[in-house]
């Protein structure tokens, strides 16, 4: 009909089904065309009018939608969908209290209060009235124990209100009425961890697994808890079970890698970190832990290779750029150190360590002017750091500003905080400073 422009007569329900089919498949132009034909044949059909408001809302035409909803309310004042859609408009305009008032009206006419209670709870979340939100999510759960989104929202409210014990009491009562609810046991275990009650947490995760042996989240949380108590072998077993229940994912491979690293199994740890990266190339922490492991094994050239690869997919990772500066400094690739430090500088996220890498690289490259300028900037961020001040002094002397350099050295010596390590480093850079008996 829509392709040939041949108009056939359908009843309102048939048009509704056609329109919903197109909406569900994202074919909004066809949905609008079918709606137009349907409205021509059934101009006062409430369900078609409501579908029109839904499409108007999707397109952001709030005023037109609101106008149509007022018209529908006159025709069918007992229709809950009118109040729900009007509430949606106010919610999108961030007028959440007006949205709540309309949803209260919807409660008086609905045959499905659970859905409306959930919407009211979410509106209260928007205005951070967690006590009221909590009340409505509890209502949802009283009506439907499997409304897990309401359960998660309720626990979020308890958390924001710092009511961990109250959350624990609620979950225990919830479990009393539904003892094989794996989600509730899982959440109770997570609460026990926050309360440092690890034995009770372990039992809760075990009960979650007993309730549903294919519930992978319980194995994952149990694995994390076993890591926390240094039982890495058992943690690996639980992670491996979760692997079998779901498709492989980077998070689990990374956790198994960490366990092997703690057990001293460097090769296995590297294998799992690499597997994690293959599954999710931008999994930053897997790159970092793999690079750290290579550094600890003194495989610096290999770690540099991995840093380069990691930055190809995680180019905005400040931690990986810091790693790049550190590793390239160790292997004396000073130009690459400067590149890394320049990026770190561009986003204003320097540490004392990276400032020193940058200044020292410029010194090794004998670029005294740049080393001097960078050192001055670093000294503004760390004004009491003798190591930086002495680097600046040495650069000034190399640039022919001997008096300024000598003055900085004298002032720094007065502070009496020059360690043997600093003294050794500065004398290696600037042998002429030996005369000052730093």
Regions found by a protein language model. Give the residues of each.
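Structural marker of alpha-solenoid helical repeat scaffolds
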Residues: 41, 74-76, 109-110, 143-144, ...
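Start-of-helix register in tetratricopeptide repeats
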Residues: 13, 47, 81, 115, ...
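Canonical positions in the second alpha-helix
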Residues: 38, 71-72, 105-106, 139-140, ...
